[in-house]
């Protein structure tokens, strides 16, 4: 039973005894006492005045006095206007801690029976994953874990954007300047090689535009008439027509990229339950476009292009099929949404996509609604801010992007340098050290990104993220390692601290604070899931680690002479370490046994 429910239940008894009135505990308002007042939890008295026929102060004091006299778990009370602030006794906190320890599934919320699909990553197969993709992947993965922890059945999915004119640009550049290069012949990872071709296409395009302008053409026209751009569109038409030569090159280069993606995902600890490919889904969208034309929802212009007019809804006309018959990005989004809701009987669908696509998802939901799909209301766009570096925004076509692979390697090196400086790993094997460096580096990267509210644009600083002090992943990892070290020392001394039976002891103020914080874990999971914000869990883990370190600084745990108190303290910190593991596990971050 939660503290809130306990108070509501006992307050209901008090009201019956004092005013001979029946009131359901669920009808009473109980919340954590605000910091400026003295108390643990507060009961709102105002709604009870109709029963007491008295003032808020008299009513609050009467209920408080009854609770103090009849409920041993309540030690003190004070009434401020219409708010009854209650303090729990030592007995209550012992009992609550016992319940937490006994609950092997502590933190897991009841099963909802809901199916939720989370789409994230969704990269283009014309470049490697970069820092922006990392935020997307880490958000998508942690939100999926968070929704699962809150009782939902979660399907993690990605849509690989493996077709379109942007893919053809890399293919065309490879034909023009690639000289037959392969990952094997160059030693370059496949996704990086294809990314180099995308940058090369942009160089070719810029040169052609400059030449056209020099020949007297205006800039706007030149950008549309550049020969290589026309060739890329022609290649896309050939691809959609099934041209064997184009399809073979496409399959070959896509294979290079997908293999590279798999290596990057593995390094990040990212997996998917279902992978969709745009090349296999874009035709689904075309079927819906035909349906929309038949329904009169879409219109076909004289040039053959198909549009949805959303001006009456405060938006623009939206292109669905180009005049040359090729589809645009939203076309396949319509088709895949329909397929997913039918295939997985979804209750909701979360798209993790950057905030530059806010308009796109407004349009997507509106068009699906116009097509008669009521489930469109259950689509949620988890819009997040961009990741920036001191140099500013990243642009793939200019080759100024920070690659995910390079960043992961940099984090590994930062973790190694910081760990080696401490000199605490001298007796660890090189293999174990390498695993630890990867765990710390990845934990630093993930935590630094996830702790920021998804809606906010953020600046990533690798060196700051690896700091063993402050609000960082390594600080929490180090805290966990410190707890495990204390428990190992206890075992070496032959101290047993099995949680059952748990002795009831006089708890210190800091121990009560830790128990309070532990108790809020399920509520934090619910709060984070409702807001689609793993930052809630990240900051909870930091608060817990910070509170433990203060406790450890002030409390000589292993020097305690009272056996019951010593046992309680060891069980307390063991429980803390378990909750830290669970919280950080939601973020996809591992915690080491030693650092």
Q: Language-model features: where?
A:
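Non-catalytic interaction-recognition regions
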Residues: 1-94, 110-595
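Flexible, low-complexity linker/hinge segments
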Residues: 101-110
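Short, charged, solvent-exposed linker or helix-capping segments at domain edges/interfaces
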Residues: 95-100
């Amino acid at each position: 039973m939660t503290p809130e429910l306990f108070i509501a239940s006992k307050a209901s008894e008090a009201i019956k005894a004092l005013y001979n009135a029946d009131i359901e505990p669920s009808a009473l308002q109980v919340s954590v006492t605000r910091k400026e007042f003295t108390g643990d939890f507060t009961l709102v008295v105002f709604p009870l005045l109709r029963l007491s026929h008295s003032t808020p102060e008299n009513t609050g004091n009467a209920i408080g006095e009854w609770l103090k006299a009849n409920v041993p778990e309540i030690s003190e009370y004070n009434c401020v206007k219409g708010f009854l602030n209650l303090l729990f006794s030592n007995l209550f906190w012992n009992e609550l801690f016992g319940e937490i320890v006994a609950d092997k599934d502590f933190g897991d919320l009841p099963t909802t029976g809901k199916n939720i699909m989370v789409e994230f990553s969704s990269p283009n197969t014309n470049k490697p994953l970069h820092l922006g993709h990392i935020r997307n992947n880490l958000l998508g993965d942690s939100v999926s874990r968070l929704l699962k922890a809150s009782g939902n059945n979660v399907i993690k999915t990605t849509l690989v954007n493996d077709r379109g004119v942007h893919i053809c640009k890399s293919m065309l550049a490879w034909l023009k300047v690639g000289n037959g290069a392969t990952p094997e012949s160059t030693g370059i990872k496949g996704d990086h090689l294809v990314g180099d071709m995308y940058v090369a296409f942009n160089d070719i395009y810029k040169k052609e535009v400059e030449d056209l302008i020099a020949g007297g053409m205006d800039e706007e026209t030149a950008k549309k008439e550049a020969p290589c751009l026309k060739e890329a569109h022609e290649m896309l038409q050939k691809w959609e027509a099934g041209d064997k030569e184009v399809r073979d090159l496409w399959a070959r280069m896509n294979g290079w990229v997908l293999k590279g993606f798999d290596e990057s995902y593995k390094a990040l600890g990212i997996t998917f339950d279902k992978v969709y490919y745009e090349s296999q889904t874009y035709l689904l969208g075309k079927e819906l476009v035909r349906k929309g034309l038949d329904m009169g929802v879409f219109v076909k212009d004289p040039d053959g292009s198909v549009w949805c007019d959303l001006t009456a809804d405060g938006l623009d006309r939206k292109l669905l099929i180009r005049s040359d018959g090729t589809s645009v990005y939203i076309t396949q989004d319509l088709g895949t949404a329909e397929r997913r809701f039918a295939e997985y009987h979804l209750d909701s669908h979360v798209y993790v996509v950057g905030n530059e696509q806010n308009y796109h998802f407004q349009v997507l939901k509106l068009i699906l609604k116009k097509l008669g799909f009521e489930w469109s209301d259950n689509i949620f766009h988890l819009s997040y801010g961009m990741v920036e570096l001191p140099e500013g925004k990243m642009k793939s076509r200019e080759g100024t992007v920070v690659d995910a692979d390079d960043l992961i390697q940099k984090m590994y090196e930062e973790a190694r340098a910081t760990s080696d400086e401490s000199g605490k790993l001298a007796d660890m094997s090189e293999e174990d050290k390498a695993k630890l460096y990867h765990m710390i580096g990845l934990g630093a990267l993930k935590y630094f990104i996830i702790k920021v509210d998804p809606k906010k644009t953020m600046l990533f600083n690798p060196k700051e993220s690896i700091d063993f002090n402050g609000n960082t992943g390594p600080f929490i990892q180090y805290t966990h390692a410190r707890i495990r070290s204390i428990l190992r020392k206890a075992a070496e001394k032959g101290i047993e601290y099995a949680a059952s039976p748990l002795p009831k002891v006089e708890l210190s103020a800091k121990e009560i604070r830790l128990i309070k914080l532990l108790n809020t874990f399920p509520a934090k999971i619910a709060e984070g899931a409702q807001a689609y914000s793993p930052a809630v869990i990240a900051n909870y883990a930091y608060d817990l680690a910070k509170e433990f370190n203060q406790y450890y600084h002030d409390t000589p745990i292993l020097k305690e002479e009272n056996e019951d108190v010593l046992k309680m303290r060891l069980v307390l910190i063991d429980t803390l370490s378990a909750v830290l593991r669970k919280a950080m596990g939601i973020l996809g971050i591992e915690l080491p046994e030693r650092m």
